[in-house]
């Protein structure tokens, strides 16, 4: 895959439930602590190395941000690092929280 794909929150949720992909959240620490998808890994410059050690390049990755804009740059970056399949989640955490309020965790 040379280009990331955009995915809606319903399809992202289904991929998570079926363990077909991992979810990363690239928002700032305060926003992440105030609420994030329960299975999200908080991906930052400081946690990128650990994420890459724990997830093979053939693991599909879904990137979540605030509204679905910043995630596009991060998705492209992960492709450049060698990940085969990367998605940017349309609507970001805001859409996730609206559609799946029971699947929001709080704290770091």
Swiss-Prot record:
Molecular function (Gene Ontology), one example: thiosulfate-cyanide sulfurtransferase activity
One biological process term in Gene Ontology: glycerol metabolic process
Domain Rhodanese: 17-105
Compartments where located: Cytoplasm
Chief location of this protein within or outside the cell: cytoplasm
Catalytic residues in the record: 65 (cysteine persulfide intermediate)
Enzyme Commission number, as recorded: 2.8.1.1
The keyword Cytoplasm is annotated on this UniProt entry: yes
A single Gene Ontology CC term: cytoplasm
Top-tier EC class: transferase
Substrates-to-products reaction catalysed: thiosulfate + hydrogen cyanide = thiocyanate + sulfite + 2 H(+); thiosulfate + [thioredoxin]-dithiol = [thioredoxin]-disulfide + hydrogen sulfide + sulfite + 2 H(+)
One Pfam family in the UniProt entry: Rhodanese
UniProt KW keywords: Cytoplasm, Transferase
Protein's job: Transferase that catalyzes the transfer of sulfur from thiosulfate to thiophilic acceptors such as cyanide or dithiols. May function in a CysM-independent thiosulfate assimilation pathway by catalyzing the conversion of thiosulfate to sulfite, which can then be used for L-cysteine biosynthesis.
Protein family: Belongs to the GlpE family.
Name of the protein described by the UniProt record: Thiosulfate sulfurtransferase GlpE
Organism annotation: Escherichia coli O45:K1 (strain S88 / ExPEC)
